[in-house]
C-alpha cells in the first residue's frame, strides 16, 4: 500500500479488502503462537505489563488480562481526534497485523475491516500518549471501541459504541491470546496521523508552487532563475523538480522575460542618477523559490518514505515469527516517526512564511 492507496481508503471512500494470502499469514502466525506459548514465559501472555512484567498471570486470568489492559489504559484527555485520524489508526493497525508479527486472532482483523468499511469510529482523545512506549493511550481508546465499549461516531453522530454497532450492523471483537496488547503496543496513532500530514503537506506544496509561478508571471520576472542549467548546478532533486514544475506552469507566458533579449542585448537603460531602470535580477523572494520549496519537497518525500516503512513494519512487542520463535524487544518505539514529523513541521512553517 502506497500513500495514494492509504488516502483513498481514509478520505476517498475506497474499501479495505485484505488478500487471502495476507489473512492466511496472520492466521498461521496466531496458530503458531498459540502452540508455541504453552509452557513458556512470554511477555503479555502470561505476565503483567511494564514494570509488572515479573508478575506471573494464572492461565484462568489470561483472557481478562487483555480486556483489563485496554480498559485501564483508556485514560486520555482533551478534544476528540477527528474521524479521519481514527480511520488512519484503524488502517495502520490492520496493515501491520497482516504482517503476522503480532499474531492476532482473525476476529481482530475482521473487526478492523468492518469498522473501516462501515465508517464506525471509536472516540479517541488527543492527549495521553508519549510515543516512547507506543501510542498506548490513544490505541487503548481504539481498542475500547473495538470491544464495543466507550463512545464513538457513526454517520456524523456521537453515541455509545453499543448503539453505534447496533445501527451499523457490526459486532464488537472478542480479545484472544494477546490481542489487547497488540492493539495498544505500537505506533498506529502517530503513523496514521503522520501519513495524513504528509498528504496535506503535498497539497500545500502544490499550492505554493502554483502561487510562486503566478508571482513570477505577474511581476514580469526574468526567467533564468528557473532555468534547467542554473538549478541543475545544485544536486538536489527537490530544487530541480520545483524549478521544472514552475517552468511548465509559465511556459508560453507573454509576461515573463528572457534576459538575453534585453539586458544581454545592450538594451538596458540608465536614469539620470546612473541607476538601471530595470531590475538587474529578481527580488530575492522570487528568484529563490526553487531553493526554498525544493528542500520542502525533499523533506516531505523523506517523511513519506519513513512513514510508509513504518506502516509496513511490525511495531509490536513481542514479535512472533512462525517456525522461528518469539522475540522480545522495542519495535513499539516511535522516534523514527517523531523525528520525521519534527522535520515536516519545519518544512510546513517554511512554506507559510
Residue ranges of model-derived segments:
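Conserved, well-structured ligand/cofactor-binding cores
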Residues: 1-353
